[in-house]
Amino acid sequence: MNVSPQLLGYVVYTAIYNVYFHPLANFPGPKYLAASRIPLAFKRLTGEEVAMTYKLHIKYGPYVRVSPDELSTISTAATKDVYGHNTRAGGVPKDFKAYYMKNQRKDGTEGLLTAGDEEHYRQRKVFAPAFSDRAIREQEPLLKKYTDLLVAKSYEKCQTAGKVDMVMFFNFATFDFIADCVFGDSLHHLESMEYHPFLANITATVRFSAMRRVLRSFPILQAIFEAFMPKSMIKKRLEHVKFCDERVMNRLANDNPSHPDFWTLVEHAEAKGNGLTKGEMRQNGFLLLTAATETTSSLMSAITYLLCKNPEKMKKLQAEVRGAFKSTDEMNTITLPKLQYLQMAIEEGLRVYPPVPGGLPRRVVQPGTTLDGSASNMHIQSVVFYSQYASYHSPSHFARPHEFIPERWSQNPPAEFANDRLEAVQAFSAGPRDCIGKNLAYHEARMLLAKFVFTYDIELCKESSDWIKQKVYIVGAKSPLWVKLVKHERAD
């Protein structure tokens, strides 16, 4: 294959410019990453970006240049500039090139994830009451229903098979609960103990989104990919969206739902004349099902694994939960937040295994945008993101960063952890576009974890001993988490 001298010269010139003369040239990082977007793209496609970024921050410090125009940071001060309310003149808005769900509707409708800042604010204001403590208490019977089903069905499966995959069951429980809140009915995974095609497609959708993020940095490759994309793949994606849209519209057509759900309060806003369009409801329904299920089930799987790998922490949590309640019927959204070690275990789980371990990218669009008070080299169109995994495992932020130690979250932590930078953990992001479902996620995690460890003694199977070692395609590529369950017999 002959390469023209002109093309070769252009490639060499571009690489030299990127490494030595680009506005980001004085940020630290390997020269091969600064020279071209290709190495970072390869790491993203192979699921190795997070592992690479962690190692780079250990070597280079709080800022690392990971491609010609992309910076990764673990600076907690910089997160206020990147994600906060006071970004200068809107200088670091969301980088929509990284979000596959952008521009997916023919009518141009966008949801919370992909709407511009002003539109996001309007939609968020409508949705906010649906995620308040009051709304969650109204949805508590649903949450109890599906956590009870998870407890019963996981044990039933363990009895027949000798072990149970908790990744599957946490997927089932979180999806059935959120589907009931979005559709007005679940898809009955916990009853059937089989994956519904819609849930099975979500994992593929997330993986596909990661690939599309890479392709959007290479317009020619993206055009070729879309031109030759198999029709079966396009059809499957359209069917996936259509299924969700139809379910949402069926729920919205029901003027007398059997129980409160996300749309109950949203429809109140609509009645006042400041609600969402039907298209926005459909798009946000799809978003809620995708984002709210995958992340919570990932967190629950990780905490289960980490507790099994640290039996003394498991015993401490079980002692707290079993000492506070005589039965799971006493557990609710009022009593569970009072359990300190339960909350500490969840916070530590989010630190050790953030559900979205990479960075949420923001793109500089205004001159003079600051990072840590310095505006000298943040040129227009550069991208910056806060690398969660790298930050949470940095020895500059945490003592013994790779160990699962809930005690570091105590109001009076052991002296060894007194200087831990707890504010570095921003698993739900930060600022005006942080996760709207944070409150619900905490309540769901408390209920699932408390009932599970109250009811069972849990043993990790050998084949899952290294479960946490995963590649990352936006979220971790989880293998089955095999455990054995033994019912705990109370002395009283």
From Swiss-Prot:
Upper classification of the organism: Eukaryota, Fungi, Dikarya, Ascomycota, Pezizomycotina
Residues spanning the membrane: none
Binding site for heme: 435
Protein origin, superkingdom: Eukaryota
Family to which this protein belongs: Belongs to the cytochrome P450 family.
Annotated function: Cytochrome P450 monooxygenase; part of the gene cluster that mediates the biosynthesis of radicicol, a resorcylic acid lactone (RAL) that irreversibly inhibits the HSP90 molecular chaperone, an important target for cancer chemotherapy. The radicicol cluster encodes only two apparent post-PKS enzymes, a cytochrome P450 monooxygenase (rdc4) and a non-heme halogenase (rdc2) that could introduce the epoxide and the chlorine, respectively.
PANTHER family in UniProt: CYTOCHROME P450, CYTOCHROME P450 MONOOXYGENASE ASQL-RELATED
Known pathway: Secondary metabolite biosynthesis
Cofactor field: heme
One Gene Ontology MF term: iron ion binding
Its EC number(s): 1.-.-.-
Sorted UniProt keywords: Heme, Iron, Metal-binding, Monooxygenase, Oxidoreductase
One GO BP: biosynthetic process
Protein name as annotated: Cytochrome P450 monooxygenase rdc4
Record note on biotechnological use: Radicicol is an important pharmacophore as an inhibitor of heat shock protein 90 (Hsp90), an ATP-dependent chaperone involved in the post-translational maturation and stabilization of over one hundred proteins, and which activity has been implicated in diverse pathologies ranging from oncology to neurodegenerative and infectious diseases.
Signal peptide, first to last residue: none
Enzyme class, first EC level, given as a word: oxidoreductase
